Each structure stands twice: as structure tokens, then as C-alpha cells.
UniProtKB/Swiss-Prot annotation:
Gene that this polypeptide is encoded by: recR
GO biological-process terms attached to the record: DNA recombination; DNA repair
Molecular function, one GO term: zinc ion binding
Top-level taxon in the UniProt lineage: Bacteria
Name of the protein: Recombination protein RecR
Length: 200
């Protein structure tokens, strides 16, 4: 029988294992690394977690995370308030910002519709999106959702819900990635790229 690491360490491992991408073995390795490097990793991480817990809030406008409410993006007067980009989670918003291709505002849904997981419209920030899309000056809502079954189901549902607002509803183009070679792509990606083709 394997020896226990002790309740404090097991609790740390258990909490780390709840993070996305970390299973029990990875969590155990992470816990050991933190404990071996207490001064360099564990203490600063503990301070950063405490500060984040105390200061980071959810933006009441878009649903992003920031230390201010409304967040820095919603408060930025230089951004195009006529464009709202809808994303699944905050990580997707951060990816869009890293790409630097969008200068409008965002709306974080907080997930996707999923019959399998029992996630319905009431579990997402759909009502606030419809309200924002109906505000004067908003002219386009861009659905930047994953190209998955749940992502497409959610996009279709949102397009129907936004039909009453006087806005254009668009989706991100899908298809061949930059640097992608056709013989390495799956059939669905190639078919979508063909349907989404545009003039050269």
C-alpha cells in the first residue's frame, strides 16, 4: 500500500487536479515542484492567488475578468462600440486581443449550449447580449465561437435570438489556416474553406 503524502499535501494535490489540463499525476508533480521550490514558487504563487481573489472581478458589461468594473476594454473610448464580438470564455477574448485584429467590444457567454452537459440558455449570458445588441449604435455582432457541435448550436441559437435586434450577425470565417497544406487538413475544414471562399 502506498504511503499517504499527508492531508495538507493531498489537499494541495486535490485542488491542483481540479484545474483544466491537470490530472492526478500532473497535479502531484506540480505540488512537488511547488513544495520543493517554496521561496521561488509557492510563496509568490500564494500571494498572487490571494491578490487575484481579492482584486479581480467580472465585468458587469461584457463578462471579462479585470481589476476594474467596467473592464479596461469596455472603458476604452477608442474602441469601436458598434461591434460586439461574442466569445465562449475569457481565454478566447485574450486570444483575440493577442491577435490584434479586433478593436470593438466583447461579450463573454460563459460557456456553450450543450444538451449532453445539460447547459441551456439560462446558464449563459444570452439575455445581456440581446440587450447590448439592441442598444443604439450597435450595428454588428460577430459570433467567434468554436467550430464544434456545441459551438455551432450556440451560434445558431444566438442568431435566432438576435434576429429581432437591428444588427448584422456574422461568424468568423472557417477554413485553411495560414501555412496549412491541404493534404494535412481534415475533410470538414477543406469543405468549409471552399464554402467560405472569397474573391482574390
Amino acid at each position: 500500500m502506498a504511503a499517504s503524502a499527508g492531508p495538507e499535501i493531498e489537499r494541495l494535490i486535490g485542488l491542483l487536479a481540479k484545474l483544466p489540463g491537470l490530472g492526478p499525476r500532473s497535479a502531484r508533480r506540480a505540488a512537488l515542484a511547488l513544495l520543493k521550490r517554496r521561496d521561488q514558487l509557492l510563496a509568490p504563487l500564494s500571494d498572487a492567488l490571494a491578490e487575484a481573489a481579492a482584486r479581480v472581478k467580472t465585468c458587469s458589461t461584457c463578462g471579462s475578468l479585470d481589476t476594474q468594473d467596467p473592464c479596461a476594454i469596455c472603458s476604452d473610448g477608442t474602441r469601436d462600440a458598434s461591434l460586439i464580438c461574442v466569445v465562449e470564455e475569457v481565454g478566447a477574448l485574450w486570444a483575440m486581443e493577442r491577435a490584434g485584429a479586433f478593436r470593438g467590444r466583447y461579450h463573454v457567454l460563459g460557456g456553450l449550449l450543450s444538451a449532453l452537459d445539460g447547459v441551456g440558455p439560462d446558464a449563459l449570458r444570452v439575455g445581456p447580449l440581446v440587450a447590448r445588441a439592441s442598444e443604439p449604435g450597435v450595428r454588428e455582432v460577430i459570433l467567434a465561437l468554436p467550430a464544434t457541435v456545441d459551438g455551432q448550436t450556440t451560434a445558431h441559437y444566438l442568431a435566432e435570438r438576435l434576429a429581432g435586434a437591428e444588427v448584422t450577425v456574422s461568424m468568423l470565417a472557417r477554413g485553411v489556416p495560414v501555412g496549412g497544406e491541404l493534404d494535412w487538413l481534415d475533410d470538414g475544414t477543406i469543405a468549409q474553406a471552399m464554402r467560405a471562399r472569397r474573391p482574390a
